[in-house]
């Protein structure tokens, strides 16, 4: 069964209709390069303007009728519409850019798929506003963001009013831009160890990073990655290998 459910409304997609917001997303896409993979093109609000960028586009749409409609309406040979559930879609092993107005209730599942996938370089995603804020570390850093911070950067874009969608959701949307780090401070081979350490910091008891990690017997790993600059602080920091303090609280969500 598709993760998007059965009826179109059950797919969770709210169509973007505000041209100002559409143009702002296209402007962000213009700052990237390479082929584009679009998640859930829906009515083609982003697909059609992106077709004028002169780049190959693969639009992955779970709704068969909408996929056929976009195919008929798109004259550009650069646009390929694929009828599939994005969560089942195999991403290319070559550099590409991810773009999408994603179903709010599938945001976490889609982000997990993307963060585990190789090759793509940038992602411009429209999601629920509060989720975009948390993923960007605004107000409170999440464990997911902290666990992937050595390999990706998360930037919060503009807030999108709920009136910009049809049907109108109960909450505002927000733009999140994710970029893959070209020269990460921690090798990807050490991802599991690093993420386990971050999980410990977010879930274990203690007054600060130093105390928590010493109690767990892994403080020397932080010292190694920080080249001796790791130190105990009263507030845990989401990006452990970096000695630059950050502000805000943390959340395990």
From Swiss-Prot:
Concerning NCBIfam families, the annotation shows:
Erm23S_rRNA_broad (NF000499)
Q: Show the ranges annotated as biased composition (Polar residues).
A: 244-253
A Pfam family found in this protein is RrnaAD
Q: Which Gene3D superfamilies match?
A: Ribosomal RNA adenine dimethylase-like, domain 2, Vaccinia Virus protein VP39
| SMART domains recorded | rADc (SM00650)
Residues given in the record as S-adenosyl-L-methionine binding sites: 14, 16, 40, 61, 85, 101
Q: Which GO terms describe its molecular function?
A: RNA binding; rRNA (adenine-N6,N6-)-dimethyltransferase activity
Q: What does this protein do?
A: Involved in erythromycin resistance.
A Gene Ontology annotation in the biological process aspect, one of them, is: response to antibiotic
According to its record, what are the GO cellular component terms?
cytosol
Q: What is this protein called?
A: rRNA adenine N-6-methyltransferase
For this UniProt record, give its keywords in alphabetical order, as a comma-separated list.
Antibiotic resistance, Methyltransferase, Plasmid, RNA-binding, S-adenosyl-L-methionine, Transferase
Superkingdom of origin organism = Bacteria
Q: What is its EC number?
A: 2.1.1.-
What family is reported? Belongs to the class I-like SAM-binding methyltransferase superfamily. rRNA adenine N(6)-methyltransferase family.
């Amino acid at each position: 069964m598709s993760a998007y459910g059965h009826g179109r409304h059950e797919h969770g997609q709210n169509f973007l209709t505000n041209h100002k917001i559409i143009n702002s997303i296209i402007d962000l896409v213009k700052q990237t390069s390479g082929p584009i993979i679009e998640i859930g093109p829906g009515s083609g609000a982003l697909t059609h303007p992106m077709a004028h960028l002169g780049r190959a586009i693969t639009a992955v749409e779970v709704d068969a009728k909408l996929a056929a409609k976009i195919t008929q309406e798109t004259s550009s040979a650069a646009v390929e519409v694929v009828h599939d559930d994005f969560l089942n879609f195999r991403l290319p092993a070559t550099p590409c850019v991810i773009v999408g107005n994603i179903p709010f209730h599938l945001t976490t599942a889609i982000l997990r798929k993307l963060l585990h996938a190789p090759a793509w370089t940038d992602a411009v995603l429209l999601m629920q506003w509060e989720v975009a804020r948390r993923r960007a570390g605004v107000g409170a850093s999440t464990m997911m963001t902290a666990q992937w911070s050595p390999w990706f950067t998360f930037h919060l874009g503009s807030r999108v009013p709920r009136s910009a969608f049809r049907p109108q959701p109960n909450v505002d949307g927000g733009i999140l831009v994710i970029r893959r780090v070209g020269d990460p401070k921690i090798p990807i081979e050490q991802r599991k160890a690093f993420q386990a350490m971050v999980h410990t910091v977010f879930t274990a008891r203690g007054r600060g990073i130093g105390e928590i990690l010493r109690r767990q017997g892994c403080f020397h790993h932080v010292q190694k990655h920080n080249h001796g600059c790791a130190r105990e602080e009263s507030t845990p920091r989401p990006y452990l290998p970096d000695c630059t303090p950050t502000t805000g609280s943390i959340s395990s969500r």
